[in-house]
UniProtKB/Swiss-Prot annotation:
InterPro entries: Aldolase_TIM, PRAI_dom, RibuloseP-bd_barrel, TrpF_fam. The gene is trpF. This is N-(5'-phosphoribosyl)anthranilate isomerase. GO terms for biological process: L-tryptophan biosynthetic process. Pfam families: PRAI. It comes from the Bacteria. Belongs to the TrpF family. Keywords: Amino-acid biosynthesis, Aromatic amino acid biosynthesis, Isomerase, Tryptophan biosynthesis. GO terms for molecular function: phosphoribosylanthranilate isomerase activity. It catalyses: N-(5-phospho-beta-D-ribosyl)anthranilate = 1-(2-carboxyphenylamino)-1-deoxy-D-ribulose 5-phosphate. NCBIfam families: PRK01222.1-1. Transmembrane segments: none annotated. Pathway: Amino-acid biosynthesis; L-tryptophan biosynthesis; L-tryptophan from chorismate: step 3/5.
Length: 215
C-alpha cells in the first residue's frame, strides 16, 4: 500500500504547488498565531482554491474554542480538522460533531507509556498523528524538528489510520517508514529553508523518498 504524505505549514503558492505536483495526499494550513507557519483565514482560502480534488485540505488548530473554528471554517473549505494541543477525547468528539468534519488528533510521544493515549483518542478521532512530544518549555506543540524513538511503534497495532511525524526529513523518512511501517507521514520543518519557508526541492525529495518501495 502506498504511503500517504502530508505537507504541513504551507504559507505560499510555490510550496503548495510543489506538494501537490509531487503527490502529497494532504496539505496543511496552521491556524496558531504563535507559529511561524501561521496563516490567516484569507490567505488559507486563497491557497485552498489552488488545491485539486483528491488532495485533502487540513486545518491545524491548538486548543481552539468554537469561535476560533467557526472563524476559519466560514472562509476556508477544509476537509479535515487537526487538533494539535491538549484537547481531551471528549473535546475531539465535540469538534467532530460541531464541524461535521473528520478529526485528526496529534498524540505526543517520548516514552512507551505515552502510547497508551493512542487507544483513548483512537476511539473518537478519525485519524491519529503520532508526533514527538515537545519539550516542556516549547512554544510550539509541533514543528520543532524533534524525533522520538521510532522503534516504539514497531509491530504495534493502531486502531485508526495514522501518520508519523516529528523530525522527519528527506534524509531519514525512508528509514522511519521501514522501522514503523507507518501508512502515512507528516512533515513541516524538515522541508524548510528557514522557519515557515518551504523549500520546493526538499518537498519533492521528501515525497519521492517517502513513497519509494521498502525493500
Amino acid at each position: 500500500m502506498a504511503v500517504s504524505v502530508k505537507i504541513c505549514g504551507l504559507t505560499e503558492a510555490a510550496g503548495l504547488a510543489a506538494a501537490v505536483d509531487a503527490g502529497a495526499r494532504y496539505v496543511g494550513f496552521v491556524f496558531f498565531p504563535k507559529s511561524p507557519r501561521h496563516v490567516t483565514p484569507g490567505t488559507a482560502a486563497e491557497l485552498a482554491a489552488q488545491v485539486p480534488l483528491g488532495v485533502a485540505k487540513v486545518g491545524l488548530f491548538v486548543n481552539p474554542d468554537d469561535a476560533a473554528l467557526d472563524a476559519v471554517l466560514a472562509h476556508v473549505p477544509l476537509d479535515v480538522i487537526q487538533l494539535h494541543g491538549a484537547e481531551t477525547p471528549a473535546r475531539v468528539a465535540e469538534v467532530k460533531a460541531r464541524t461535521g468534519l473528520p478529526v485528526m488528533k496529534a498524540v505526543g510521544v517520548a516514552d512507551p507509556q505515552d502510547l497508551d493515549a493512542l487507544w483513548d483518542y483512537g476511539l473518537v478521532a478519525d485519524m491519529l498523528l503520532i508526533d514527538a512530544k515537545p519539550p516542556k518549555d516549547a512554544v510550539l506543540p509541533g514543528g520543532n524538528g524533534l524525533a522520538f524513538d521510532w522503534r516504539l511503534l514497531a509491530g504495534r497495532q493502531i486502531l485508526k489510520p495514522w501518520l508519523l511525524a516529528g523530525g522527519l526529513t528527506p534524509e531519514n523518512v525512508h528509514e522511519a517508514i521501514r522501522l514503523t511501517r507507518a501508512p502515512g507521514v507528516d512533515v513541516s520543518s524538515g522541508v524548510e529553508s528557514a522557519p515557515g519557508v518551504k523549500d520546493p526541492d526538499r518537498i519533492r525529495s521528501f515525497i519521492a523518498r517517502a513513497t519509494a518501495p521498502i525493500l
